[in-house]
Swiss-Prot record:
Catalyzes the ferrous insertion into protoporphyrin IX. This is Ferrochelatase. It catalyses: heme b + 2 H(+) = protoporphyrin IX + Fe(2+). GO terms for biological process: heme biosynthetic process. CDD domains: Ferrochelatase_C (cd00419), Ferrochelatase_N (cd03411). Gene3D superfamilies: 3.40.50.1400. It comes from the Bacteria. InterPro entries: Ferrochelatase, Ferrochelatase_AS, Ferrochelatase_C, Ferrochelatase_N. Keywords: Cytoplasm, Heme biosynthesis, Iron, Lyase, Metal-binding, Porphyrin biosynthesis. Transmembrane segments: none annotated. Pathway: Porphyrin-containing compound metabolism; protoheme biosynthesis; protoheme from protoporphyrin-IX: step 1/1. One of its GO terms (molecular function) is ferrochelatase activity. Pfam families: Ferrochelatase.
Amino acid sequence: MFLRLFKYLWPERYLPEIPAQDPFDENPPPCGPGRVGVLLVNLGTPDEPTRGAIRRYLGEFLSDPRVIEIPRYLWMPILHGLVLAMRPKKLAPRYAGIWMEEGSPLLVYSQRQAAGVRQGLAARGVHAEVELAMRYGKPSIPAAITALRERGCDHILAVPLYPQYAASTTATVVDAVTRHAGRLRDQPALRFVKRFHNDPAYVEAQAGRIAEFWQAHGRPQKLVMSFHGLPRYSIELGDPYYRDCLDTARLLRERLGLREDEVEVTFQSRFGSARWLEPYTEPTLAELARQGVTEVDVVCPGFVADCLETLEEISQECRDAFVAAGGRQFRYIPALNDCPPWIEGLTDLVERQLRGWPTGNP
């Protein structure tokens, strides 16, 4: 407070440097409509597969009240006293096992998606700047918005890369984007993509990914569609995530021409002791094996880029559970990643959402 008062008493000394274009110029250059920016946002990842980097990432992720919806005074001692003290040690070798030469798979594939959308929009004559951000970790949302603003973007479309809406994923991206944009003196116009769980471009790309895999490797007895889990209380409080997942599963099943008994919908990545969405993926796979199912394929339609939850939890842990229970053939169908149909579909989605904004010649 004293420092602020001090600055008001001697304002000239503390004024920021006046920009080259005088804001009080009586004859300013004509002001155009500005440029359009696209902000693709995924969850985030540690910078490297080390305990320290994982601890920093988890600390930011699990401190978000949208993610852990219990009182702060109860959760923060648990987070700092137990979770951050123990979890990084367990996760470090798991991250190391999936790490790519270029870095974290989630970051690498997300960067390729951003590059693909940038090129795709340009090829269609849509002039838009494209940036990638992570909700937790780097590149951060504030840094990405700053980069777009520095390139003259006064319209920003934020695209959370979560097909199914959840408060703990999509809504927290909206929170972060609006929080940072709200601090700007010259605020950009904002739009958000809420969900795309039933978008034809997404469904077609995901179904095509499965069909292409089967064309190369043959079809199994069962297809398991595993979505990230949520605590049941999230749904009871009004979160539409569960319904979105079922809609996606139905659309994919119909597009692939499968009967209901050929598909299982499950939920993975349970955290803590609360009851989460069921059935759980790993026990379901073990039970299928005990029932005599020897061949399963698992796809994760909620993940548009491969990450720890798909490459380690599904492809390794769930495989082990299925085989240990008597299963013979377990195959994980990779996420959409940077496959051309998905890049094309994501570009379609972005282009549609930009309608009405100045995307012509800059």
